[in-house]
A protein has these predicted regions:
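Internal glycine-rich alpha/beta core junctions
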Residues: 2-140
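Hydrophobic alpha-helical bundle architecture
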Residues: 113-117, 136, 143-165
Length: 168
């Protein structure tokens, strides 16, 4: 989990590069002189984030690598958490026919036909969240490759998927 969380932190640096003012294909044509610098400085101040100007505007408008990379880092974190949740579910199975290696707290009534059974509801909930995050990353991956030539207009759906993942 620690390695996955470090990957998320590293991917954040790429997201701090702002590509505003590149116009349609990253040339900056018809953008007022100094616009990018002023806007990035103001966005950085208002958001309290360390935003910087994107140096390669053409690349950032045709490739959504930074968003896809952040999404995959979040997905990998979810994969790690999902694995831990699966282990908890299996280790807490029992009390008669399961592993019964650990006891987890009962969140609600267990089984009516198996007295004493505690359902691993929280671990199952974590699994469902992880599945959703993995699905969101699939959306980001398809959107990242859906660009055509110098422009990828799929950023809104990519950002929605990433924000949904970080909101879970």
């Amino acid at each position: 989990v620690i390695k996955s969380s470090h990957a998320i932190t590293r991917s954040k640096k790429q997201l701090e590069q702002v590509a505003l003012g590149g116009t349609a294909v990253g040339t900056g044509a018809n953008t007022p002189r100094g616009y990018r610098k002023i806007v990035v400085k103001e966005l950085s101040r208002v958001s309290k984030l360390g935003l910087i100007e994107q140096k390669n505007m053409q690349y950032s408008l045709q490739s959504r690598f930074a968003v896809a990379n952040a999404s995959s880092a979040i997905r990998n974190f979810a994969i790690e958490l999902g694995k831990i949740s699966n282990d908890i579910r299996l280790m807490s199975s029992g009390p008669v026919a399961g592993f019964s290696e650990i006891n987890i707290p009962a969140v609600h009534a267990g089984s009516s036909i198996m007295p004493g059974k505690v359902n691993p509801s929280l671990a199952e909930c974590m699994n469902m969240i992880c599945f959703s995050i993995i699905g969101n990353d699939t959306t980001v991956a398809f959107a990242a490759q859906a660009g055509q030539f110098e422009l990828n207009v799929m950023l809104p759906v990519m950002l929605k998927a990433v924000l949904d993942s970080t909101d879970m």
